[in-house]
Amino acid sequence: MSVDQTLYSRTPTAMADPTCAGPAAFTAAGAFSQPDLMAFSLREEEPIWGFDTIAPSMASWQGKMEQQTFCNPNMERGLKNTHVRNGQPTPPPFDDKKLQTPMGEMYPVAQYAFNSSPPEYAPPKHRSSLSEQSQTDGYGVSTRRRKASAIDQCEQQQEREKREKFLERNRLAASKCRQKKKEHTKLLETRFREVSNKKGELESEIEHLRSEVLNLKNEMLRHAQCGDEAIKIHLAQMVRLITSKDTPNRDLVSPMRSPEQMAASTPHGLSFGFDGPMQLPSEMGSPLDQRRDSEQSIMTESSYTFSTDDSFEELINV
């Protein structure tokens, strides 16, 4: 196989691959002609032109393939000045540094833009989308939390205001209750003082009336010997009342008396549900009979004589 066949058989493959489609390939394909290639012969087993393309699976292969494919940018000039010795090409006889053109002028990068983006950049986009989604989720959660916290603060503020109002009402009610209690206490104190004063006045009036009664009784006793019938009757009633009151008092004053004496001191006129009063023996009731005789003698209308005046005055002053 000749070089011409090798070159034209592999050029479409190199052009078909978009990753290896560079300006050097187009320049080399347009610069070679069939008469120039027939000037020298090459072995078929020694491939000099690196037009074989490999579809890269990673982004790092792109730089390596460009270096291997376009290792000599001045391909046309090199092919014209190359001489083959012992089956291998020799370098050109003159310096290439003077004739080399910069890569930026020969191959402008802006004119050759790839249509499809490499698949290696898809995962970072996915990660960025996940991060953006997490950021949006976090922002939503934070906003919800802020709203919830704001609602809680509003509720707490309302509860605090309600409690303050309730406490204020309680304080007002307590102050009113204390004021009413003070007023009621003052009213009771004034009423107590008034009643106490009234009681004192009444007690003093009672004492004054008692003293007047005693004075009147004494004045009446002074006139007992005047012989007035009304005075004598009134004095007899007074003696009877005094004796009726004095008999139970004597029983209470002498606790050392025997039961027989207590039975003897009971009056004859007691009735325990019978038709007539119960009669006591004469032996036990002899002192009482004597006294009753004396009382009857005093109360008789025929005689109003007294034994002694001193005994009567003692009975009055008891």
From Swiss-Prot:
Keywords: DNA-binding, Nucleus, Stress response, Transcription, Transcription regulation. Residues 160-223 form the bZIP domain. It comes from the Eukaryota. GO terms for molecular function: DNA binding; DNA-binding transcription factor activity. GO terms for cellular component: nucleus. Induction: Expression is barely detectable at the basal hyphal growth phase but induced during conidial development. Residues 160-199 are annotated as: Basic motif. Disruption phenotype: Leads to weak conidia formation on hyperosmotic medium. It is found in: Nucleus. Residues 114-157, 275-301 are annotated as: Disordered. Residues 202-216 are annotated as: Leucine-zipper. GO terms for biological process: cellular response to heat; cellular response to hydrogen peroxide. Transcription factor that acts as a key player in the regulatory circuit that integrates secondary metabolism and cellular response to oxidative stress. Regulates the genes involved in development and stress response through direct binding to their promoters. Particularly involved in the resistance to oxidative stress in asexual conidiospores. Belongs to the bZIP family. ATF subfamily. This is Basic leucine zipper (bZIP) transcription factor atfB. The gene is atfB.
